[in-house]
């Protein structure tokens, strides 16, 4: 918006600029993005804003007498994809496909389709899929399109697409089948997930670890532990599959849900032996399962073991272990690990402290929560909506209403940037506080603010109407707000009016 306004002002004040063509504008953008010693990749990576054109940079590069090879363009596009710069990544592959001198691989077609979904949506991706020139490339591109259907929970489209792929003979691996099972699990169609397994067996499509994990979860939903154990035994006998921590954790979770604690603990110990020092994911997955068993020792053991994995321990890792310790009731250790994170963090992520802040407030430790909040501010932490929600709810619970109202105002100021909504109980508690203490003006401002945010309810309006009656004030504007909010009047409201 600001850029458009700037160009509009320049156009009005300097007529010579209005005579410049679109081509000269593109050239000026390209020149600002490129210096004499830049290579093609550096020039494109400098395009920070999506509106700027990677296509223009490539074309300018080629027009200047340089070459752009398939391998170089491929590398740049994949790097941009990893950085979530989808528009520029798509522009590169689109330009590449239009060049007769450059060949698109099957993987290029698949990635381009994936990028089309991210930038333009499924409809355009479907159109592109039908234009892919050969079966090898279609085979590669079918998975990202199917994944798009799964992500959108588009069951009918996914099923129709699978029928089409089957007719073309393109279902030769477990991956499309796994996508369908994920879709059926997400939409609670567990019997259909089992039908996918039957189809795989009928067509002799080999299963992988994910296939078995999804199969076990579907069986758990339909027929319980015994059928899950049968699937697990079949997996053990499958020479093409190695049972790892993920399958064992799936089995352990089934046991936990079934109340078979001893079996769950035995399987979790077996899963721990499958962990490696290559990746931390398994450690934290098992840690959460131990937490569900209220097994503090298991949480500690996995936390310490995870430190043997190379690389920096992330904020997400710290959030996981602190959350687990809070859930098993060990706030002392949770605080110790929080302080460990704080001593090593590069950027102060308020989400980490929010976990401990929430634990303090839920346990009635208001002074500890207030002290932690002040400490995070001193350290440069920036409160988010969750911070204010935690403080607001804690202060309402402890009767510190002035502080709660202040936190509410700060939380409301953030509503335009997020989808957070305070609970109706908290809003009603604040309204009742205003009513009890005769704070008529404050109550009016509060309910109007809640109305503008679309959060008003019948109990809130009742409270404000009672105050209007007590103060002998007209309530026409309140009734108008109720009408806009489509609040139906009950007998109590009618009596007040």
Give, region by region, the residue ranges found by the protein language model:
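N-terminal targeting peptides
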Residues: 1-146, 151-160, 164-175, 188-192, ...
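Residue-level detector of the short coil/turn that links helix A to helix B
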Residues: 84, 120, 153, 188, ...
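C-terminal structural cap/anchor segments
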Residues: 361, 367-436, 446-449
């Amino acid at each position: 918006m600001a850029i458009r306004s700037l160009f509009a002002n320049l156009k009005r004040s300097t007529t010579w600029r209005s005579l410049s063509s679109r081509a000269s504008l593109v050239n000026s953008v390209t020149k600002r993005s490129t210096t004499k010693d830049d290579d093609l990749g550096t020039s494109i990576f400098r395009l920070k804003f999506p509106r700027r054109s990677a296509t223009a940079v490539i074309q300018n590069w080629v027009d200047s007498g340089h070459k752009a090879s398939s391998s170089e363009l491929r590398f740049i596009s994949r790097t941009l994809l990893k950085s979530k710069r989808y528009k520029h990544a798509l522009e590169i592959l689109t330009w590449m496909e239009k060049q007769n001198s450059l060949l698109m691989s099957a993987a290029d077609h698949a990635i381009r389709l994936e990028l089309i979904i991210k930038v333009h949506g499924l409809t355009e991706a479907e159109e592109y899929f039908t234009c892919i020139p050969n079966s090898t490339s279609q085979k590669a591109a079918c998975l990202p399109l199917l994944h798009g259907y799964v992500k959108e929970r588009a069951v009918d489209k996914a099923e129709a697409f699978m029928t089409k792929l089957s007719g073309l003979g393109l279902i030769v691996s477990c991956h499309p089948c796994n996508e369908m099972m994920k879709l059926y699990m997400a939409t609670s169609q567990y019997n259909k997930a089992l039908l996918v397994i039957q189809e795989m067996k009928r067509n002799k499509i080999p299963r992988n670890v994910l296939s078995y994990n999804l199969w076990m979860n579907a069986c758990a939903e339909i027929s319980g532990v015994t059928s899950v154990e049968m699937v697990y035994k079949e997996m053990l006998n499958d020479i093409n599959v190695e049972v790892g921590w993920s399958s064992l954790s799936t089995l352990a979770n089934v046991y936990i849900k079934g109340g078979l604690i001893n079996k769950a603990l035995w399987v979790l110990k077996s899963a721990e032996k499958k962990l490696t020092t290559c990746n931390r994911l398994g450690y934290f997955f098992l840690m959460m399962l131990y937490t569900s068993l209220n097994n503090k020792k298991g949480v500690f053991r996995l936390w310490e073991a995870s430190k043997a994995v190379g690389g920096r321990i992330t904020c997400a890792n710290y959030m996981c272990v602190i959350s687990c310790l809070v859930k098993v009731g060990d706030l002392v250790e949770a605080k110790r690990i929080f302080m460990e994170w704080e001593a090593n963090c590069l950027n102060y992520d308020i989400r980490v402290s929010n976990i401990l802040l929430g634990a303090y407030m839920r346990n009635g430790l208001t002074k500890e929560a207030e002290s932690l909040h002040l400490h995070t501010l001193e350290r440069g932490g920036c409160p988010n909506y969750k911070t204010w929600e935690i403080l607001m709810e804690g202060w309402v619970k402890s009767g510190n209403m002035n502080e709660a109202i202040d936190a509410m105002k700060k939380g409301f100021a953030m509503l335009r940037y997020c989808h957070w909504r305070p609970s109706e109980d908290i809003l009603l508690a604040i309204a009742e506080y205003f009513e009890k203490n005769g704070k008529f003006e404050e109550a009016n401002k509060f309910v109007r603010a809640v109305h503008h945010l679309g959060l008003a309810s019948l109990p809130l309006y009742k409270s404000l109407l009672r105050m209007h009656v007590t103060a002998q004030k007209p309530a026409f504007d309140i009734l108008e707000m109720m009408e806009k909010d489509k609040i139906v009047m009950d007998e109590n409201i009618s009596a007040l009016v």
